[in-house]
Amino acid sequence: LGQVYPGQMDSTFVPVRSHHYDPELTFDFCVNEPAWSNQAGIHSAFGSTDRLYFRKEVPVNHDNDLSSSYSTTVWRGERANAQILVWSSEALEQVRVSTQDLRSAEGNIIPKDRITFELVRYVLSNYPYAEKKAICGESPYKSGFLMPDRFETLDRFDLPSQTTRPVWMMVDVPRGTAPGTYK
């Protein structure tokens, strides 16, 4: 294979697909397999919405972008977005993400039905992450790359062993929401 990049896969295994929403491809490579050795159990963290996290890699805390909590400022009538990462060295079945109403100290509420989650699925790309010279047309890379990109409605999901799964969280703040800090 030569140089291995995060999300890289052997493109000779890629079947010709009829449309974009077919099941994910699953034959990507892990760049840092030893990192999984100290990842027993299930892990989760909020990650940066400006970073891509690869399925076969343990999330790395670059620039303190992984956190156990999420905080943002948002206007009434707007949407706040966050990325939740779930990873495990062991296979897990029926993983669910749930929430509760957000409440202010004054007793105001953002109802939990205004908080939604979508699974981030991986799609085939001609270029590795952060490639500065990506163009439409033929790629100089012989391999394809799986990039986290497509959102899919989330009820629950299975997490294969040594896998990271991003989940996109959206909080739609109602227009009539009273100002305050909601938790």
Segments (PLM) and residue ranges:
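Mature N-terminal, pre-catalytic/accessory segment of carbohydrate-active enzymes
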Residues: L1-K183
